[in-house]
Amino acid sequence: MRTNEREIPYNYTSADDDQVITHLFGPGMLKTLENLRTKRVTGRSARLLFRFMGDMFIIERNPFIFQDFVDHPVKKRNFFKSIEKDLGIIEAGARENRVFQVIERCREYLDTLARRINTISSEQKRITKALDTIIGRENIYFDPFTLTAHATDATDWRLYPPLAVVRPSKESQMAPLVAAIKELGLTIIPRGGGTGLTGGSVPLTRTSVMINTEKLNTIRGIKQFKTESGEAFSGIELEAGVITDHAMAAAREKKLIFATDPTSAWASTIGGNLAENAGGKTAVRFGTAIDNVLSYTIVMPHGEERFVYRKDHSLTRISPNETLVFQVKDAGGRIVETIRLKGDQIRKPGLGKDVTNKTLNGLPGIQKEGCDGIITSATFILHPEYNLKKTFCLEFFGNDMTEAGRVITEISTAFENPGDEAALIALEHFDEEYIKAIDYKTKAAGHGKLKAVLLIDMVADTEDTLDLGESLLGAILAGFEKTELIAAKSSKEAERFWRDRKRLGAIAKRTNAFKLNEDIVLPIASLADFFDYVDRYNTEEKRYNQNMLISSITAYLDTAEPLEDPQWLVSKTERAREMAAREQKKIALASRESLEEETHAQDFYKGVLELLRGYTLVTETIKEIYTRTSSRLIVIATHMHAGDGNIHVNIPVLSNDREMMKKAGKTADDIMAKAVELNGVVSGEHGIGVTKFRHLSKKKVEAFNSYRTRVDPLGIMNPGKLSDIDVIDRVYTPSFNLLGLEAGILKYTSLESLAATIANCVRCGRCKAVCPVFYPGKNLFFHPRNKNLGIGSLIEALLYVTQRTHSTRFKILHHLEEIADHCTICHKCHTQCPVNIDSGEVSVMAR
């Protein structure tokens, strides 16, 4: 590990120098440079070499900068001349063979980049020529804005932008489109709403064409069907790009329930829901996507269309002992395969959700995360609405989650098999970290500190049944003194209760919108043990952070240089060390409550400031250390679909702090290990993607690889996904937690306010549904989520241009004008945003 992890300039990402070097040149180059480190004399060659790497990294990752070189040949020629001059200077000063090898590798990379820039226009023409007759030129995108918006999903992890984005407008176009892309020798990534939480649609190669299904958004209607036994039921036929909320609304109009309702229903799409086997708050009653799908169409990697139909649908949540039969037909209607699946193959026995069995006996599409084809349409069963619904809010008070865990377990068990009795179609929990993040207003008088909240929707067909359900709930809670029950008195009040649940994205605001967002599933009986584990983990992280706070301040005092009276500071420093030792001993033995209040760390901090009163420079630095160290506290925040044990674990993290990122990564690994220890699984909704692949069992990986090789031997679909165990170490995220020169540039160019305003965007897509300039039928995709990604990339480009050329003549700003002009300033997005971004104001600032 180098002493200075950030010698490569223009790197406004989470990647440290080791990661950048490995990304560009492979691990061999990193080893060579480590060996050459001790050979530096003046360091000039190293600075030029690292600047070269900074140039290459940002040109590769930023479509606006890359396109700028394509559009301006003279600028490109001058730039490459200056790079060659720098490499020549390094070469002239070289004294050993390894340096010449490094220069040769750099020139090879430079030649490759030059070829890419010189040939990209002809490559785009080749792609357009092949696809134009299938989907139309207007549905083929190479512009930097679109490529940037498709470089990541809700995770913000990324590696490469896509080569192109295509948006078919008819389902019939999909099969020939896939076949044509295959003939071009390119790979394919399916994408719907971009709401994925594991990086499933993040491009991992330079040659991926992303097929966006958002224009396939027709709701074909609600129809009547019959099971093989003659039982009538309703179903809804949908194209893959239909937004989940729209499907739910269409069902609601007919007093029916569309049960596949992930939290991201405002932006997620039907195809993605099936590819992930998504569930949501009603999964406790009706199951996930696989429980509710009747049939679907999928285009396989070679362009063949397949129709998959579930025979004799049970119209209920799949039981562990049930056997499902799916028939797979080709485009001519011929049955080519019959797949049988047992309930315990879909979900591990004892669990409410489980998406870790990727193979599912070879069932196409479902749970495959876009690795075996593209789902183009589907029919889902619909459930009759209950006549009555009542919403309850449970508030848990106290210093730990012990009682909350027991209450949730007892409620879930009591209402497990409702039959004709009152049923719970939603049990949604969030903990104290979310309570703080969303500024939750306590509804009950309480018994002290609010520890967690549980929202419940209880349904029934008669008043008597609903009353009995409420009585049962009250009886369960009678033995729990720290739990308060509040019933919503009206539908409007119920809506207000649930509004808090929709604002949980605010958890990442403290760390500029980046967090590790994982989900696990546990047996209901293990919930109390897990809550206790999280409580203890968070307590120990507070202990660690407060120790680090004191250690960092005392370490600074050993090197502090005051403007006056340095000899007096020496004696005061010795006194500060004594205070530090005393308070650190107390921290080692401190209770949860004491650590929560930061009692001993605060005593030390205030004591040191008082001790050094008058040493303004020193005390101001101590305040900065306090703020910086406190912000590095690792916190596990949890919310969950309580009825099926599906827990969502969020760890907010500062993406520019590599050590914090590593610590957060270890925390996520610890959570996964604990889930397995408690007989759970590492995902019930989010999928595996790039973030969880290393936690998938070897047996499941081998089974999926075997299936994938059979259906996609050329590796056309979603390359790198669910196959590269080290990919999580290669992806990175942008980071505008900038200091020094970059912050000064932002201020000088009037971009500081713009950058600060969009910095908290969590890419949830809630803005999309209400945005007038999101209109797929008219090729308008300028909703705030996409715009914020584009603006962030443009700010990065402007920082680079300013630092690299020492100029503020920004030709690249015309892209910002285009983004800003696509806004009606209606402010509808503002009311939807969980982190309170007013994108109307963003557009005004951009203009």
Question: What label would you give each PLM region?
Answer:
Residues 127, 131, 180-181, 407-412, ...:
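Short amphipathic alpha-helices in soluble, non-transmembrane regions
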Residues 66, 128, 137-144, 258-263, ...:
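Flexible, glycine/charged-enriched surface loops at secondary-structure junctions
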Residues 507-511, 516, 545, 572, ...:
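Activity-critical C-terminal alpha-helical subdomain
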Residues 1-179, 197-234, 263, 381-382, ...:
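N-terminal flexible segment immediately upstream of the FAD-binding catalytic core
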Residues 85, 89-119, 177, 246, ...:
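Flexible inter-domain linker/hinge segments
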Residues 662, 737-758, 774-847:
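Ferredoxin-type iron-sulfur electron-transfer modules in oxidoreductases and energy-metabolism complexes
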